């Protein structure tokens, strides 16, 4: 049985440091720089949980790392603790309020830093997934913000990060931690979506018509309940996809176009329960080896996802039940066939769908957003 790793950080945000700190770990955290699976597995797997009871202050966390008392009593190595403290820094920073907005110049500069990160870490898939999973919790039937979910930066809080669908996304927070610290005038919600759109573009995909100015959810109490993101292998894949994406206000064309982003990345069985440990396409780099990809060139954004599913010629390529559904359902198939034959049409529809997804549930300040 594959082992899934998740983080649980117990403590009240922005409270004084407690007198003791207890750290336990039942499995080592494995950091990887290139991974993706938009859809979570419905199959069960064992989970390793790391728990911390500590202040949410970033400065306090840093002091803990160098504390002799912690060093002598902790069962974790310094390297493993640093991974946990990265997530802690995302939880502890004071969130933006409705009176704040991301700084346009900082957004532009952060975009350049993200491009540099992508060129050295090959982390396009996991950054795409980060933006999607923050936005994909939106429920159009709930009017109140931030209870309605969506692109509000709530994925930085441990209560949401430990959802099964978000397994491995602590690695995405690790990757962009320094950028967030460098550009404090950018909301988490904006940074997640900026990273996602930039990753698509830098992988050769279309330019996404993005806007910024998203306001951050203020605390873990604003996180949505678990279960709003799609499964990979539900009993009725087409019905399940519609239930999830219609709840967001998206339609069949959006569903198929967004599915095409699986042209990037790999599924890792230790996270999702799906895919092979490695294939001829993933046994070597770039990035950490392993997993099973949907396409041979899994860091290139193109329409090969649709071509490969249609042809079904390579057993080393992954096809999830929800992937197969886009060619089995009569309405989905219209778009899937179109995108397999016409990459320009796919790029056009994908750019619109991605921008739509990135805005779901967001509270913008100014209301019209910021274009950079």
UniProtKB/Swiss-Prot annotation:
Biased amino acid composition, Basic and acidic residues: 267-283
CDD domains hit by this protein: ascorbate_peroxidase
Record key words, sorted: Calcium, Chloroplast, Heme, Hydrogen peroxide, Iron, Metal-binding, Mitochondrion, Oxidoreductase, Peroxidase, Plastid, Potassium, Transit peptide
Cofactor(s) needed by this chain: heme b
Recorded catalytic activity of this chain's protein: L-ascorbate + H2O2 = L-dehydroascorbate + 2 H2O
Cofactor binding remark: Binds 1 heme b (iron(II)-protoporphyrin IX) group per subunit.
EC number: 1.11.1.11
Transit peptide: 1-91
Disordered: annotated segments: 1-28, 217-237, 261-294
Keyword check for Transit peptide: yes
Top-rank EC class of the record's enzyme: oxidoreductase
A cellular-component GO term for this protein: chloroplast
Binding site for heme b: 262
Family, per entry: Belongs to the peroxidase family. Ascorbate peroxidase subfamily.
PANTHER family found in the cross-reference section: L-ASCORBATE PEROXIDASE S, CHLOROPLASTIC_MITOCHONDRIAL, THYLAKOID LUMENAL 29 KDA PROTEIN, CHLOROPLASTIC-RELATED
Protein name (Swiss-Prot/TrEMBL): L-ascorbate peroxidase S, chloroplastic/mitochondrial
